[in-house]
Amino acid sequence: MTQNSSKPVGIVGGGLGGLASACVLAARGHKVVLFEKSPWLGGKAAVLEADGYRFDMGPTIVTLPSVLKRIFAEAGKKIDQYLDLVLLDPQWRCFYDDGTTLDLRQKPSEMYAELDKFAPGSAEGYRRFLEYSAKLNDISQKYFFYRSVGSIWDMFKANSLFSPGLITDMINIGMGKSVASCVRSHVPDPKVAQMLDHFTQYVGSSPELSPAVLCSIAHMQTDEGIWYPMGGTRAVPLALVKLASELGVDLRPGCGIRRILTDTSERATGVETESGEKIELAAVVSNSDSVRTHRELLSGSKASGKFEKRRKYEAACSGVVLYLGLDKRYEQLVHHNFVFSHNAEEEFEAIYHKGIPAPDPTCYVCAPSITEPAVAPPGGEALYILVHTPYLRPGQDWSKMLPDYRRVILQKLASTAGMTDLESHIKFESFLTPQDIHDRYRVLNGAIYGLASHGKYAGAFKPANRSQDIPGLYLAGGSAHPGPGMPMALMSGWIAADVLDIDARAGVVTKPARTQPV
């Protein structure tokens, strides 16, 4: 494969990772064709519009705008030419079942003051936690981000094992520790700890099972802030689609892929569409779920079996999403809100160990009209409610489970967030269940966040962006490195494009060395 190959690079899937890959590759001079099964581009970052209400259907929080800036910079563009980003502060409001509330502020000095009023003595622990989070972020920037990584060996193989500071970095990364233990070693107050635990909800995993390195998310959010794109998070994929079109990418929504084609040496050579058309390609970037890519798009290949044997990947959690169009705004809400469970341990035990919906769940509530009134008719609200649930388990029929669980959710909002009259103000309603998410987005077992980040040692690692088994195949999206969440999915697309471009400029697609087991 060469950069000037007559064959285009194919992108399978038009989610955020696929769109990012397409833009970067096109900006670097590659011919690119993108295939997307759905009639829209953007994957989970879709939109629902009805009766004067507009809802972001998937992600609602934009963090790390530096990732987006990097993608647009590939084409010599500035992000503000495409997006109008508004900084949100407070970043979240937390509601507890004892009637107290706590705002998460971006500026540490303001947060220290909040904490010392809320839980005297917690400010110093939070300050130390942020210092530790910043160290973890520095290590992530050095070894983990913007490179194809599938294991701890990949993190360090580009660096001498005897390089200065390596041992210190290995110690500071907190291997063998969980997010929950790290948080509580700094901030023992249970309510403050519950707030900090929820940084891991960006990756759909239990803080008790996730590696401490994910505490770095706190620094990332404090450093770069939380942002809202006017027009909703749907504006992000629309901006990428606009950039891709300007760069000459051949965008094909409504064109699903049946399988990825390989030659006798199991090198990716093209795709077969669901209509039966076979298209030769210089290389393939799969923005489909990485496990389903191997099970379905590469079914029958030796590589599929190797992928499954290398490591047992578990789906991240799923969720129930309620889209409620209201004729009322709730003044106690800010843009982003967490309505917390009474007992976090019992909640996570239900979701991640028992595989059942939590009887007393935490509800994430997005009330965007405070920032963009146009999302609803005057005086109204386009309320988005997300409650994490287990990924799909055998025997779970969400068409029967949803009505009862909807009542649980609304009762939680009434008892803990004071939304006692919510039912009477609903003028429009829609929803997604784990089964809907599984069917709509073709993800593993209805997982919202790709693969779980569980495991105190290997939990941070997802499949590498350069396939270990199939030359010419690259992986992007929330189930590939560096993992789930809006900025990470975008970064995965950049990485997949970057390593593909490196291989193209070298004139060959070489099979990478085997990654050692963790």
Where would I find each of the regions flagged by the language model?
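A glycine-rich dinucleotide-binding beta-alpha-beta segment and adjacent secondary-structure elements
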Residues: 189-203, 360-366, 419-482
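N-terminal glycine-rich phosphate/pyrophosphate-binding loop and immediately adjacent elements
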Residues: 3-143
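C-terminal segments that line or cap access tunnels to active or ligand-binding sites in enzymes
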Residues: 327-437
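Rossmann-like flavin
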Residues: 97-209
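Mid-domain catalytic core of redox enzymes
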Residues: 249, 258-377, 517
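A conserved FAD-binding loop/helix module that cradles the flavin
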Residues: 59, 478-500
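Active-site-proximal substrate-binding core of FAD-dependent oxidoreductases
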Residues: 262, 501-518
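Helical element adjacent to the flavin cofactor pocket in flavoenzyme catalytic cores
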Residues: 216-268
